Amino acid sequence: MRYVLSLAFALFAIFPANADQAQLDRGRAIYAEYCTLCHGADGRRGQGFQTPIWGPQTQIAKFQNALGLFEYNEVLMPFDGPDKIDEPAKWAVTLYLLVNHGAMQAGQTLSRANAATIPIR
């Protein structure tokens, strides 16, 4: 019985980390496919948007928390067709933006359950 419990706790510890990394990896891929043209690969500037979107003194801070950023992305991004990306993909790309900004760390998951508690400065 002790072995079974140990195995269960070990699996619980492993799979969330993998799932968290999967969300970040998905966000990175979505950003590369849908966001790079306008915002640039480094979030600093692209063909359509010349203002950096993450980092010190950038536009991302105006959203105050992760939920505000997600809601903006949900309604308006990508600019050429917000319906091109489903809700889980928008959570993933929002996580990617927040990790690049330093508001979240790799290994964390972003969802409606925790987004309002994650400040953006």
Feature map (PLM): residue ranges:
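Bacterial N-terminal signal peptides
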Residues: 4-14
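Electrostatic cytochrome c docking/interface patches
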Residues: 13-30, 81
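The canonical Cys-X-X-Cys-His
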Residues: 27-42, 93, 97
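Gly/Gly-Pro-rich "capping" loops immediately C-terminal to redox-active cysteine motifs
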Residues: 28, 42-78
